[in-house]
Structure formats: structure tokens, C-alpha cells
Amino acid sequence: DDGELYAFITKENAPGHFPYTAGVFPFKRTDELSARMFAGEGEPERTNRRFHYLSQGQDYVRLSTAFDSVTLYGRDPARRPDIWGKVGNSGVSIATTDDAKRLYSGFDLCNANTSVSMTINGPAPIILAFFLNAAIDQQVEAYLAEQGKPAKLLDTAYRGELPEGHNGFGLATVGRRGDEMVDADTYAEIKARTLQTVRGTVQADILKEDQAQNTCIFSTPFALKLMGDVQQYYIDHGVRNHYSVSISGYHIAEAGANPITQLALTLANGFTYVEYYRSRGMDINKFAPNLSFFFSNGLDPEYTVIGRVARRIWAVTMRDMYGADERSQKLKYHIQTSGRSLHAQEIDFNDIRTTLQALL
């Protein structure tokens, strides 16, 4: 009846309409079944081979980068022989821009069908700089090839054989700097175009690190300043397709929080970033679209509505408290099945647990 219809419109609403309880977009994408497997092991070339294996036959390249503990804590593996056993363990070792060039070589980082996720927090601004410079230098390489002046690969560009599907793109600038290979005006043009095109996400959520995971390498105030500096750089250079932070509840849940506490702390962290960025004079509609979220899933009943509640709270607050526009009101998130829920005992049931979480 009319009453039920009114209740649906005001409380449930249709996808793509404020407050986006049922979804921020009116329709589900039909051109892609997104697959983004977390990957990272050993040296950059080894993970690069893994990336190419995972991307075989895929129309859309979705790379999710796992870094080793040495990288997560911002250490230089070349200077620490005492931690040799940790280098490349459970993630890829990245310490230079050349490492990033090798890691993502063979993938056009400016292709509209390519997106890169990087799970890094403490040293996130530095790793992000490696990534962006790798993307820029890729386009310098492409420009030189178009001009009939292809750069010659150095012998040290890539250790080992190129994997299947690897065309060598991105390796010609290994050991070189793109700004030294073209004139200043050309480089500035390539850089501007690259920054406005490159797609992906860097986690960089330092508040949840303090609360749950603790891969902090700076004090919280200084880490927040770095986050603000990165976001201001995004605004100044028109970086619109790359998310400067993935505000994460997953790690909070893995540390022991129930679904309600996970959501409360994650939204609180998100609004803290909003307040901090605004205190630095940033326009909310220029930075809010660069914020993304990441939640854990489990078998608790509250997980069935965690995304719906999050979208609604975010949309109402952004509109009514901050006067944000429609794009800024839309909370976009990724959700992942819980590792904490998996047991060593009766391990065969873990497949069932994960399947049920995925269905939720």
C-alpha cells in the first residue's frame, strides 16, 4: 500500500538514491566480475610473474599488492643483514622506485582497465611515491617509443625471464629517471596526464594502525600530517581516480572487535580524517571522493547489514553536517571474509565458513 511504499522510499530507498542504503549505484556492473587476489612474495620480479599469472585471460587487470614486513615497517633490506630471513617473506620487498617499476612492469598503469591496490600504511607516502613515479616513467617510455626513440633496456632491468604475457613495458626506465630522458615541458605534460589517469588505492589508514595492527613508523600527529600532504597533492594535481586512503575496519575486527564496534571505530576514523583535512583548508568535495572503506565479514548476524548502515550514516552526516555534494556522500567499500574466524582445529570446515561469509 501507499504506507509501505512511503516507508520503503524514506527508510530503505532504491539503489543510487540518497541515503544510499541499498547501494551507491543504481545498477550492478555487468561488464566485469571483479577479481583481485592478494599477492606478494620475494623480490619484485617474482611477484610480477605472479601478477601476470593471475591476470592471464582477464579483460580487467586488478592487482592487489602484499608487502613483506621489512617494507611494512619502512626498512631498507640492503642495510639489515640481521633481518635477511624476513626479506620477501609473506610479501614483496620494495625499497626503491626501480623495485616498483619491476613489480608493475608489463602492465600499463594508465590503462582504464588497470587498477592497483597497495596494502601499506606506515610508509605509505613513500611507497605511493614509488608507484606514481613508476607510472609516470612508463608514460615517458611510451612517449619515446611513439617518437621513434625507444630507450634501450639495461642489463639489470629485470632479473630472470619475462613471464608469459609480459611485453617488457615499463622496464626501459629502470636505472634511469624519466625527467632526465625528455625535456622539462614534455615531462610536466606527461606527469600531469598520468596523475589524472592512474587508478588504484593505497591503504594508508594510520588511525586503525594505532588501534589494531600497529605498523606505525611515525608518531600519529606526523603520520596524519603526511596523509594530509598526500591528499593536498591529489587536490593540487587533479588526482581523481586514485583513492588516497582505504579507511579500514577489517584489522579492527581481526584484533577482536565485534561488527558494531568495527563499524563505529571505522566511521569515527573516517570522520576524523574529514575534520582534519577540513582544518587544513581543503574543500570537502575535492577530497571526500578519494576516500574508500574496507570492512571485515563474518558469521555474526550484524554483518548482513554493516554496509547498509555504514552507507546511510556516512551519507546523512556528509550532507547534513558538512554540506557535501552527492559524490562525496557515497561511501564506497570493499568487504573481505574474516581470517580470525578460521580454525586450526577441524580445518576442513574453514572452506564452509568462508563460503557462508561470502554469501552474506
Language model segments and positions:
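Catalytic alpha/beta active-site cores
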Residues: D1-I306, M321, Q329-Q336
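Long hydrophobic segments that form regular secondary structure
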Residues: G307-A310, M318
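A generic alpha-helix surface/boundary motif
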Residues: A129, R312-I313
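Flexible, glycine/threonine-enriched loop-and-boundary segments that flank and lead into catalytic domains
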Residues: A315, S338-N350
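Catalytic-core region of carbohydrate-active enzymes that cleave or remodel glycosidic bonds
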Residues: I347-L360
